[in-house]
Amino acid sequence: MPIKQRLALIAFGGNALIPENQRGLQDEQMQNAERAAQLMAHIVRKGYELIIVHGNGPQVGNLLIQMEEAVTKIPPYSLDVCNAMTEGSMGFMLERAITNELRRHSIDKEVITLITQVLVDRSDPAFEHPAKPVGPFYTKYRAQQLTREKKWAMVEDAGRGYRKVVPSPKPIDVVPKWIVRDLALAGRIVIAAGGGGIPVIINNRGFYEGVEAVIDKDYAASLIAREVKVDLFIILTGIERVCLNFGKPNEREIPVMTVEEAQKYLDEGQFPPGSMGPKIRAAIEYIKAGGKEILITDANHLKAALINRSGTRIIEDRGQSIVSPF
C-alpha cells in the first residue's frame, strides 16, 4: 500500500529577505534567501512535500519608489504588474537558494515559482475603503497632483509625508490552485502567491482583470492550504509564540489553543489587525474548513517548534492529540 504523501505549507513575510535593519541590497536579499532555504530544506528532509507563500511588502515598496524616481523617463507599471515583478524576482532568489541547499544535502528535487493570480470579489467593501499604504512618501503638493491626475487615494503619515493607499480585499479563489496541488504532489517544491498573489477580478465580459490592490499573504496562504488540503500549515512571524496581553506586564505565551479559544481572543481584541490578527484569522479559516493543525512561530524557533518544543499550535479541540509531525 503506497505511503500517503504529507503536504506542508509555510508562509513568511517579505521582511525575511529585507529585515528592517537592512537596505535591501541584492546581495543582502540573496544571503537572507539562503538562510530561509535552510529552514525549507529541513522541512523537506523530514518527509513533507512543500508549498511556500511569501510576503513582498518591502520589495514592492522599493519597486514603487524606483518607478516614482524614474517617472519622467520610463512609464510606471500598475500595482498588479509590480506584484508580478516581485513574485518573479523573489521567487528566483528563493528557488536558487533552496535548490542549492537541497543539493548540499544530495536531495534531487525541483523548485518552481508560479506567477499566481488570485481572484477577489469586485464588490468587496475594501474597494470602497482603501487603507493599505504602499510605495514612497510624497509631499503634499505631489500627493494632491497624483490625486487629481490619477485619482489615487492618499493619506498623511504625521511628519513623514503622504502615501498612496490601496484596497486589501479578501482572496476567494487561487486561479492555478490545481497546478499548485499537482506540482506539490508530484514532488516539486512550489513557491506560489508571492505577496499574496496578483489580485484579479472577473470583469463585465467574464474575463480576468488585474486591479490596484494588495492581498494579505496570510489569507492567501490559508486559502491555498484549505483548497489543496495541506496536512500542516506553518506561519512564520516575528515572535516565538503567540501571546496574550502582548507587550504588557501580564503578557502570557500560548503553547496550544483551540480554534474556539482563538476566536474568543480575537473578538476580545487580543490580536491587532495590523500584526497578529490576520494570522489568527487565517488559522481559524483553515481549521474551520477541515484543516488539521496550524503552527505559528519565528524562524529561530521553527526547528524546535516542529518537535513540539516551541511555537504556538492551533487545533480544532482539546481532544485532538498533539503529536510531533516529525
Question: Whereabouts are the PLM-identified features?
Answer:
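C-terminal catalytic "cap/lid" subdomain
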Residues: 2-326
